[in-house]
């Protein structure tokens, strides 16, 4: 069962759930709290590698990822990031989120953006119990026109689902957690699997 808006507000008030900066009450509706787009992005430079062998030796995977992933792009205030048709880019939420050990979060893109071809969180929309940090967004433009994305715009909504108990291995206590305390548009760390 997911938390309703009243419970989200109560959990934020009690510090059981942390979203910084905290969304205003008008951005907490039904069963979700809105999240906004941050100003950090990364793009893929596909022309620098023919392919990435995801099951290859770790050093080769790392080398390929370093060739295809751009440095972090930090947009100045008021600037837009343009995502062209068929492009994949990483971005980050403006908000940092901290979940307790007994709650799993779910991030969904906005329907209004999907109707324009924007996929906000391509496949990985689960936020693990014990998570702390910004959420990296995997953008894909499946539409026909470039999309201008501006930091601060509402990009998605988080819902929160209490579990049957506390996780024995929440994300913040796992030694193998690749994205623990994530800040910025962190690229794939698939080679650490």
UniProtKB/Swiss-Prot annotation:
Biased composition (Basic and acidic residues): 170-179
HAMAP family linked to this entry: dCTP_deaminase
InterPro entries: dCTP_deaminase, dUTPase-like_sf, dUTPase_trimeric
Entry protein name: dCTP deaminase
Keywords: Hydrolase, Nucleotide metabolism, Nucleotide-binding
Annotated TM spans: none
Function: Catalyzes the deamination of dCTP to dUTP.
Binding residues for dCTP: 110-115, 128, 136-138, 171, 178, 182
Reactions this protein catalyses: dCTP + H2O + H(+) = dUTP + NH4(+)
GO BP terms, alphabetized: dUMP biosynthetic process; dUTP biosynthetic process; nucleobase-containing small molecule interconversion
Pathway(s) annotated for this protein in UniProt: Pyrimidine metabolism; dUMP biosynthesis; dUMP from dCTP (dUTP route): step 1/2
